[in-house]
Amino acid sequence: MAEAGTGFLEQLKSCIVWSWTYLWTVWFFFVLFLVYILRVPLKINDNLSTVSMFLNTLTPKFYVALTGTSSLISGLILIFEWWYFRKYGTSFIEQVSVSHLRPLLGGVDNNSSNSSNSSNGDSDSNRQSVSECKVWRNPLNLFRGAEYNRYTWVTGREPLTYYDMNLSAQDHQTFFTCDSDHLRPADAIMQKAWRERNPQARISAAHEALEINEIRSRVEVPLIASSTIWEIKLLPKCATAYILLAEEEATTIAEAEKLFKQALKAGDGCYRRSQQLQHHGSQYEAQHRRDTNVLVYIKRRLAMCARRLGRTREAVKMMRDLMKEFPLLSMFNIHENLLEALLELQAYADVQAVLAKYDDISLPKSATICYTAALLKARAVSDKFSPEAASRRGLSTAEMNAVEAIHRAVEFNPHVPKYLLEMKSLILPPEHILKRGDSEAIAYAFFHLAHWKRVEGALNLLHCTWEGTFRMIPYPLEKGHLFYPYPICTETADRELLPSFHEVSVYPKKELPFFILFTAGLCSFTAMLALLTHQFPELMGVFAKAMIDIFCSAEFRDWNCKSIFIRVEDELEIPPAPQSQHFQN
């Protein structure tokens, strides 16, 4: 009984829905019937005759004014549409049509029927888009005092944006501070220094923190749960103060290296002490975590100093030791520093070994990993690659692998080839990058352009094949080939990360929709005709009659038909009729 009642209700519901779907036709015929019945009381015939009389008395100037007014309104709508498209990257009319008119016309039903099946996929894609739009610390970032500031002194331009430096300040507070900093005077001063916006105030605070390292303090060291001892120790020198001075005050890489070595001595002592006490409470555990971050940062920057000063083998050894000592600290992306140093040494076998470990599907990709893999594949075939020969005989297996690797890299970050091929000028890389964005492309090309130039024919192979990637992903914002769809947020984030004098690369390139161009041309042509008709009514009348006579003439129709037949013959390539041959006896 319950099932029968449910079936009856479903049928009744479907009948009601069907009746409401076609109810507008009933209303339409009902309105027509009312108009026919009330035609005499409403004096419809008299009103129609009055309207026709009014239209007959209108002069051509009225129609010209009406046309000009409509063209003006259309032009204003066009200007607003163009402004909205430039600002938000989408058409206002299209957005209103999709968002508001489509649900009224029943377009939501198709999407809602699949909503339950695609809910998990949507959540996964949302999580992926959030992770791809995350801003990452640039593993190859330069030194502020020795490199960024020197660029400012020479050119007068600021290579870093306020947003980028603010992110760096947040990173420093996360890595170099903890809740127990107020117990040590030097760390308390540095905690305030990392929040300071003025560079000179930060440097002064770092010097002040180093001046109080001779203060003695009583440090309580618990041995067992039932007893404690008290011992007097000298407060160690503040390692984070040396870090700040090396980053911002040192004007050369050599000076920065000296300060980082002093920071290493102080940071190593703090790390060993906190390592022994890390299990005695959450406070000591937080101190050990902070000291670990400080030590890893110092060793990594020392390796980068050695790389800058030409001691590349020493830098490679320091990076390998650091990765073995702290294998879980992947947030610094030390393997990207190692890849760049190994490419400088032309140790391509070691580069391949590092890629085999980090070019994994479970790890986040980067332009360094994708383009380094493409460079190694291209190195095997680039010296003998020729576009003409490849078009004649086809691509070999090795060449196909190299082209696929280039397509994979270009799909991940399509901005890099323009910098590697020197189609766009490079600037100093920012301190933070957005993966798959223009900022990451600048950071990669700034350090790896020399490695691509060193491999003979690699840039030629890249030049011949990189644009073929876009044929495989005609709609990159909706669907990718090997990666997730390209994130929409890259342009906005890159504009905040990169300086204003740099022209941000945009992908995919926004093009004006066809209907905007068509509307612009139609409005312009109509306004021009209205203006000419108003100024020269007789001449435009003669011109209009002449055009009508031309289009209505028999010669024009014959010429049009002949042109159509000639075009069809050209497309079909109809051969001429064979000539008859006569044989003589």
UniProtKB/Swiss-Prot annotation:
Protein's organism: Dasypus novemcinctus (Nine-banded armadillo)
InterPro entries given in the database record: ST7 (IPR007311)
Residue(s) carrying Phosphoserine: S386
Listed CDD domains: ST7
The protein, known as: Suppressor of tumorigenicity 7 protein
Pfam family, one: ST7
Gene: ST7
Chief place where the protein resides: membrane
PANTHER family according to UniProt: SUPPRESSION OF TUMORIGENICITY 7 (PTHR12745), SUPPRESSOR OF TUMORIGENICITY 7 PROTEIN (PTHR12745:SF10)
Family of the protein in this entry: Belongs to the ST7 family.
Regions that span the bilayer: 15-35, 62-82, 512-532
GO-annotated cellular components: membrane
Sugar-modified residues: N47
